[in-house]
């Protein structure tokens, strides 16, 4: 039932994070500093220039083509007599250091009294890549660096004996720096440029390059191509107040909470260009070196600069709740009535997302042995058409704590043995967008010329047909499992099997509609997927004196099946995805020449 609590937003799972709160007995300060050195566990073994040149000649010979390098040129690679014209460059060592450094400083402060508690944490993290630093142009730093600073404060205020106020605020700054070419894509050049292609620089200081590899000099791309600097800022705040209503009836309480998230980002780019050249060298049969240098491109001493605002997101959430928990002898009953409203606004047009839900949750436990939990959620999305914005999401679960039965009292090694099962319905509107249910129009229709200058004017055109009967994606999920704790809770095991059917997935409607209609057909809610699997974990935690140790293992099995994606007619049955795994790769098997 946990996913059903989130209605139209719960089908893909929910991650709940509980942060630390303050203590009520004095002040506690913790300071942790971690310093790490990242080293290359294993580096690739690249062919040197002489080996590469021989391999290239062999490959050309196999295709019946003339050799690229003659004997004199091969000898020049071997001896290194002409390091600029017949170079031997180890691009890996020229661009990477042997180590990278990581710093992490974390300070936390916790304290307070019975009336007021606080918890504050400051977390600073910095990671410097093994890629080498630009030492030639001090106007920008291309060393790939990740820097993060997070400050969090949680407050608990006991306003009265029955009123508790909680507040939290988080500020986070993240900065990413690196070469404009890309910290990851530069490795494509390091791996792809042969050691014999060109030198790092020629004697005149111009970077090496060629008509084949262009400006793809890894050292130049790392140090002299400009840099990028991405800065992201996040501000999260939440406030809640809980009122104990035991004066009305024992176990009754009300709570209201509001939260705001503000996320923004900036992308700064510095552009720089450089010249590159190639000597186009050759060695004649008598050993004479002949060069015909060619220089390409231009040097740009003035840095180009862009600083666009990259992204913005504003999220707000309001929740009101009345809950009841009480014990009558062997009977424990509980319930909650919750209203939730969420709004997410992103930069751009038609990028807002709004959801609201009303849900009822009820629980019953008898003698701490048998429990039943039921949820009913009425959830809506602004993406859906008027009159059909809301759907119902029920769920139910049951558990039997076998270890609390009388016949288990003599089984002393077992501390907990629980069997549980659940079934529920949840939804997902994250793949929807605004006005899918409306006919769309564009400006790409037949046009005309008008006016003194006979300027062209485009006409209107019909876009995709609307999605008829648009609904949110549905997930029906059933689980069955057990939990075991034994030997004073040192041994713990969990096994859970699950089955899930995803339906009403948006897929193309064109495949089931004849092209004679003459217009682009929109999507339809006809996709169906199935999932089934098993999760299991086993762990042992114990101590010998003051030495604590633990060992564990986990296993997951997942089988997926495409039931329907509205696929078009295929000439051969093996081309259909139906019945195969979701995301399965398809291709031809190479069985050789015959």
For each feature predicted by the language model, list its residue ranges:
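A beta-strand signature from Gram-negative outer-membrane beta-barrel systems
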Residues: 1-30
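N-terminal plug
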Residues: 2-9, 39-43, 469
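Short, glycine-/polar-rich solvent-exposed loops and beta-turns at beta-strand/coil boundaries
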Residues: 7-11, 45, 411-415
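Residues embedded in well-ordered regular secondary structure
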Residues: 21-133, 307, 324
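Conserved small-residue
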Residues: 30-83, 181-182, 436, 527, ...
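Acidic, glycine-rich flexible loop segments
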Residues: 67-89, 104, 185-216
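Extracellular/periplasmic, surface-exposed regions of secreted and cell-surface proteins
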Residues: 103, 154-163, 168-173, 179, ...
């Amino acid at each position: 039932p946990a996913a059903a609590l989130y209605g139209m937003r719960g089908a893909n799972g929910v991650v709940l994070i509980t942060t630390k709160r303050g203590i009520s007995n004095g002040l506690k300060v913790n300071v942790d500093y971690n310093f790490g050195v990242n080293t290359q566990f294993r580096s690739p073994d690249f062919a040197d220039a002489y080996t590469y040149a021989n391999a290239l000649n062999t490959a050309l010979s196999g295709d019946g083509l003339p050799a690229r390098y003659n004997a004199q040129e091969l000898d020049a690679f071997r001896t290194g007599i002409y390091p600029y014209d017949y170079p031997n460059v180890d691009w890996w060592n020229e661009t990477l250091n042997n180590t990278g450094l990581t710093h992490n400083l974390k300070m936390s402060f916790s304290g307070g009294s019975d009336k007021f508690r606080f918890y504050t944490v400051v977390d600073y993290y910095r990671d410097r890549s093994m890629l080498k630093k630009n030492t030639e142009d001090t106007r920008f730093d291309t060393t790939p660096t990740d820097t993060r600073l997070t400050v969090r404060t949680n407050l608990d205020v006991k306003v009265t004996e029955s009123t508790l106020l909680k507040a939290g605020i988080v500020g986070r700054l993240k900065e990413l720096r690196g070469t404009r070419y890309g910290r990851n894509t530069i490795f494509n050049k390091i791996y792809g440029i042969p050691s014999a292609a060109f030198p790092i620089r020629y004697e005149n200081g111009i970077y090496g390059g060629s008509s084949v590899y262009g400006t793809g000099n890894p050292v130049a791309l790392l140090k002299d191509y400009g840099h990028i600097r991405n800065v992201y800022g996040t501000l999260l705040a939440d406030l809640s107040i809980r009122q104990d209503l035991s004066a009305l009836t024992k176990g009754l309480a009300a709570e209201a909470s509001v939260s705001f998230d503000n996320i923004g980002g900036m992308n700064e780019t510095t552009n720089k260009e450089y010249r590159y050249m190639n000597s186009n060298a050759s060695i004649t049969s008598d050993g004479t070196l002949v060069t015909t240098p060619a220089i390409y491109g231009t040097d740009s001493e003035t840095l180009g600069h862009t600083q666009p605002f990259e992204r913005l997101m504003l999220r707000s959430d309001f929740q009101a709740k009345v809950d009841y928990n009480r014990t009558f002898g062997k009977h424990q009953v509980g319930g909650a009535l919750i209203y939730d409203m969420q709004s997410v606004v992103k930069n751009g047009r038609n990028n807002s997302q709004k959801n609201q839900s009303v849900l009822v949750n009820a629980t019953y436990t008898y003698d701490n042995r048998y429990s039943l939990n039921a949820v009913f959620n009425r959830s809506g999305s602004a993406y859906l058409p008027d009159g059909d914005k809301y759907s119902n999401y029920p769920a139910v679960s049951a558990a039997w704590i076998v270890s609390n039965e009388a016949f288990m009292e003599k089984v002393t090694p077992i501390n907990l043995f629980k069997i549980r099962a659940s079934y529920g319905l949840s939804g997902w509107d994250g793949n929807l967008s605004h006005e899918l249910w409306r006919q769309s129009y564009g400006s790409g229709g037949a046009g005309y010329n008008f006016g003194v200058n006979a300027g062209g004017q485009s006409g209107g055109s019909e876009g995709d047909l609307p999605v008829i009967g648009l609904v949110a994606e549905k997930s029906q999920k059933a689980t069955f499992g057990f939990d075991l704790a034994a030997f004073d809770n040192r041994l713990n095991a969990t096994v859970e099997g699950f089955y899930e059917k995803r339906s009403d997935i948006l897929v193309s409607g064109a495949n089931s509609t004849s092209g004679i209609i003459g217009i682009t057909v929109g999507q339809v809610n006809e996709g169906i997927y199935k999932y089934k699997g098993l999760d299991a974990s086993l762990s042992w935690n114990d101590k010998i004196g003051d030495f604590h140790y633990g060992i564990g293992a986990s296993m997951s099995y997942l089988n997926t099946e495409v039931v329907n994606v509205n696929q078009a007619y295929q000439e051969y049955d093996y081309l259909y995805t139906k019945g195969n795994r979701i995301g399965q790769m398809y291709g031809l098997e190479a069985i050789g020449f015959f």
